Amino acid sequence: MARGGSFSRLRLRAGVVVAAAAAALLLFAVVAPPAAALNIGLQSAGDGASKAGLCSRTCESDHCTTPPLLRYGKYCGILYSGCPGEQPCDELDACCMHHDNCVQAKNDYLSTACNEELLECLARLREGSSTFQGNKCMIDEVIDVISLVIEAAVVAGRLLHKP
C-alpha cells in the first residue's frame, strides 16, 4: 500500500514539474525576443566583435540534473549549443545537435516536430549508449532531464498549435 501511495505522489510531482516546465516554456515563447530563440553564436555583435564565445567547442558535463543549467557535450542544454561545424561529443550530443539544427531551421523552440524527433532519439539511447571521455554525468539521468523538459515543450507546442 505504501509503495502505491509513494508512486502516486511521485507521478503527481512529475505532473506538477511537467506543468510548471510547460508554463515556463510557454511564457518564454511569448516574451522572449526572437534573437533569444536559439543561441548558436551566429548573431551579430553590432560592433564587429566575434560572438564565437557564445557557442561551445568543448565537451562539457556540468549541472547534470538541473535543467536550466545543464551543459552536456557541446549541444545539450537550454540556450546552449556547439559552434558551427563542431562535431558532437557522443550519440546523446548528436541528438541534441540535430534538435538544435531543426529548431534553428524552423526558428521555433516549441516546434512539435523537432521536439518529438529529439524524444525519439533519446528513447533509442535508453537502450544503451556510450559517452565521451571525461564525462562526469550519468547519461541516463541526463536523458531523463532532457526528456522531461522536451515533453513540456511538446505540451506547450501543442497548446500553441506549433507544427
From Swiss-Prot:
The active site is at 99. It is an enzyme of class 3 (hydrolase). Ca(2+) binds at residues 75, 77, 80, 100. GO terms for molecular function: calcium ion binding; lipid binding; phospholipase A2 activity. Inhibited by EGTA. InterPro entries: PLipase_A2_dom_sf, PLipase_A2_His_AS. It comes from the Eukaryota. Its cofactor is Ca(2+). Its EC number is 3.1.1.4. PROSITE patterns: PA2_HIS (PS00118). Keywords: Calcium, Disulfide bond, Hydrolase, Lipid degradation, Lipid metabolism, Metal-binding, Secreted, Signal. GO terms for cellular component: extracellular region. GO terms for biological process: arachidonate secretion; lipid catabolic process; phospholipid metabolic process. It catalyses: a 1,2-diacyl-sn-glycero-3-phosphocholine + H2O = a 1-acyl-sn-glycero-3-phosphocholine + a fatty acid + H(+). Binds 1 Ca(2+) ion per subunit. Disulfide bonds join 55-83, 59-89, 64-137, 76-96, 95-121, 102-114. It is found in: Secreted. Residues 1-43 form the signal peptide. Belongs to the phospholipase A2 family. PA2 catalyzes the calcium-dependent hydrolysis of the 2-acyl groups in 3-sn-phosphoglycerides. Releases lysophospholipids (LPLs) and free fatty acids (FFAs) from membrane phospholipids in response to hormones and other external stimuli. This is Phospholipase A2 homolog 3.
